[in-house]
């Protein structure tokens, strides 16, 4: 368990994570699209800030019910998931109260890849990392942490290696 002293209040509005199963924007069934190829309207509907990945187009990959990326279908929640390829990332602001919290999600290594560990980052502090061992099915990950001050924080998931890992159904309580 990790504690944080450097959280700060950005505003007093209650904010929760949005689009945690990546169902928006809806893309064509049996397809995928890189974040860098989304239209401005699609990026706004995505709700996450995304980037990274030195490959072009940049950013993570939104996937709808296809096995092309080597992830087991069905996905844990809904018809879409997100793949963090190389050092791509997603981040979003949310409100957290003082106390104990848990972040959880499902992850899956791309078939044929070694694991791409995913760092879980809260306001620039890594609070956990998924296993570096390749997993060929959707695997549940959970990390508990403590916040010492209530306020809005940045929740970020980021790839660390040059391989690909799918994620879905992010929950923070």
Predicted regions: what is each one?
Residues 131-136:
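A short, sequence-level motif marking secondary-structure junctions
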Residues 2-100, 104, 111-121, 138-148, ...:
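Aromatic (Trp/Tyr/Phe) and Gly/Pro-enriched flexible surface segments
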Residues 154:
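Σ70-family region 2.3-2.4 aromatic/basic alpha-helix that recognizes the −10 promoter
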Residues 124-130:
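Surface-exposed loop/edge segments in extracytoplasmic proteins
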